[in-house]
């Protein structure tokens, strides 16, 4: 079947409320509020509610712990400002992928998409949904651990539901994100206000001598920063959907400037609230810090905490799915994945094949269950690609002076972020060397085999296999190649 023009087949444009003529491509459905909600909703998952102790464990006192949380927020903001320059200079979806392509060529871009799409993003999606499932199941299995099969089935159902919602409508996906972000901000506000009230009542014992017993070694401080910045991961999510942002030149930087400082303030104030009712030792021993806080402060309404933590995790999962599907779509459009993964639903105008592919890979990761170590070992790879991308920003200042830059950050900002990236790449390897890091590097480099076989040389036998797959999936899912918007 030839890839016929979709203009004759577009019959259901009523699902997209606009008087402008539509092409079968991703539509600009995401405004400033939705952009802020994507950033906030994706960064704030379950970690700050369940286990904000990773930073404290490495600093061993309250004062340095709060300073690290604030410093990590500043660094995340600096990194996001660099991505704002990139996103307004190269207005393509896909996050780091188009920037690496423009700065260094197809091979680094392919290795990024290979690593992200096969390991990092679907495994993170699976972990978030498993966390959601465990919190929901806990309400029905009081006093005992829920069966693993039940947890996995509920997590798989959550993945299917989120994938379906985002495949049905961009607008519906963004509305769901807005609702769950509002829900998590409600519980954040409850914890912060309760903490401030307790602080005003004189619960300041844990803030006295707050630097006593602090760890000052380079190794401990580096691990504290590493864990803190991991909690801020997601600051670049809006760059994955640049093509769907209304007025990206304005809304992308504004969403960053509003969203990340908001998260930073929330993280600092929530930690302060926790320390008003828990000593550092008690916080480190708590299995779920927000639940412990709720039991001590909000009783008999403490049940709202696990409920809203579940809302928070499902919101983070929705934001992750919403943005990651665009990376698959862009990689397919560039010929770095199956071409059908870049196709658009005729009726829904969503990257449905990319989202379905992403959901299937995430469900596969649920089967073994314990994939936290996989994500931990691959997290240094995330900073490898962050650093390469921002290095590309510096390189393009000299090699692509012709590109228009609506936003241009001072050169010291990307240099700082590059140095931090190098530090975060080397810190876990030096402090806790393990063979797994070598395996991660080998996996990343193994993408070169697939690149040269299927992308660079494009062997005929591979095309003979992919063509019937594309043909049947196109008919089954009612999808077509994306068109360019009319100028």
UniProtKB/Swiss-Prot annotation:
Gene3D superfamilies: Amino acid/polyamine transporter I. Residues 56-62, 138-147, 194-217, 275-302, 432-434 are extracellular. Residues 1-20 have a biased composition (Basic and acidic residues). The modification Phosphoserine is found at residue 18. It is a multi-pass membrane protein. Coiled coil: none annotated. GO terms for cellular component: apical plasma membrane; brush border membrane; plasma membrane. Keywords: Amino-acid transport, Cell membrane, Disulfide bond, Membrane, Phosphoprotein, Transmembrane, Transmembrane helix, Transport. Residues 1-31, 85-110, 239-251, 326-351, 392-410, 451-487 are cytoplasmic. Residues 1-23 are annotated as: Disordered. GO terms for biological process: amino acid transmembrane transport; amino acid transport; L-cystine transport; neutral amino acid transport. Outer medulla of kidney (at protein level). Kidney and small intestine. In the kidney localized to the apical membrane of the proximal tubules. Pfam families: AA_permease_2. GO terms for molecular function: amino acid transmembrane transporter activity; antiporter activity; broad specificity neutral L-amino acid:basic L-amino acid antiporter activity; L-cystine transmembrane transporter activity; neutral L-amino acid transmembrane transporter activity; peptide antigen binding; protein heterodimerization activity. It catalyses: L-leucine(out) + L-arginine(in) = L-leucine(in) + L-arginine(out); L-histidine(out) + L-arginine(in) = L-histidine(in) + L-arginine(out); L-arginine(in) + L-phenylalanine(out) = L-arginine(out) + L-phenylalanine(in); L-cysteine(out) + L-arginine(in) = L-cysteine(in) + L-arginine(out). Disulfide-linked heterodimer composed of the catalytic light chain subunit SLC7A9 and the heavy chain subunit SLC3A1. The heterodimer is the minimal functional unit. Assembles in heterotetramers (dimers of heterodimers) and higher order oligomers; the oligomerization is mediated by SLC3A1 likely to prevent degradation and facilitate heteromer trafficking to the plasma membrane. Interacts with CAV1. Belongs to the amino acid-polyamine-organocation (APC) superfamily. Associates with SLC3A1 to form a functional transporter complex that mediates the electrogenic exchange between cationic amino acids and neutral amino acids, with a stoichiometry of 1:1. Has system b(0,+)-like activity with high affinity for extracellular cationic amino acids and L-cystine and lower affinity for intracellular neutral amino acids. Substrate exchange is driven by high concentration of intracellular neutral amino acids and the intracellular reduction of L-cystine to L-cysteine. This is b(0,+)-type amino acid transporter 1. It comes from Rattus norvegicus (Rat).
